[in-house]
Design a protein with these regions (language model features):
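Sec-dependent N-terminal signal peptides
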Residues: 4-14
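Beta-rich carbohydrate-recognition modules and glycan-binding surfaces
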Residues: 2, 16-149
Length: 149
């Protein structure tokens, strides 16, 4: 089966909060923080790219691509590491995004997610206008029963 999807998602801000205190905010100003990963790492043929775009006084990260289920593929993603950021008390991840009326997923990895296919996941559906999505950390679902809750 071959399914080709072109999409664009624009994320204006991303922040981790512990109650009302912001622990970390990404302003999307460094080209070195984010990396693109596609299903090509496992033989897929999906293609994607991202860039930074100024929207008003803020910067956003824009992810675009073609996703194909050919060769057992079907994903593109952007990823960044959070070094020297203590997230132990974080309650929520807030994403401000817009896109093409599709469902998107946030995957969090921890020191327990050793294998590449392990993660904690939450989803949200973007529309044509920017919207804040507050994703409680406690609602992220683990990708396998071997991961702690």
């Amino acid at each position: 089966m071959y399914k080709k999807i072109f999409f664009t998602i624009i994320i204006l801000s991303m922040s981790f909060r512990s109650n009302s205190e912001i622990v970390f905010t990404d302003k999307f100003t460094s080209n070195n923080d984010w990396k693109i990963i596609t299903d090509q790492v496992m033989g897929g043929v999906s293609q994607g790219k991202f860039n930074y775009k100024k929207i008003g006084k803020d910067y956003a990260i824009v992810l675009t691509g073609n996703v194909s289920t050919k060769n057992n593929g079907g994903f593109i993603q952007i990823r960044r590491k959070l070094n020297n950021v203590n997230l132990n008390q974080v309650k929520n991840l807030t994403v401000q995004a817009k896109g093409n009326n599709e469902k998107y997923f946030v995957h969090l990895r921890t020191t327990f997610t050793i294998l590449p296919w392990q993660y904690y996941q939450s989803s949200f559906v973007v529309g044509n206008n920017f919207k804040n999505f507050v994703l409680p950390i406690k609602n992220f679902k683990r990708s396998g029963y071997l991961l702690p809750k």
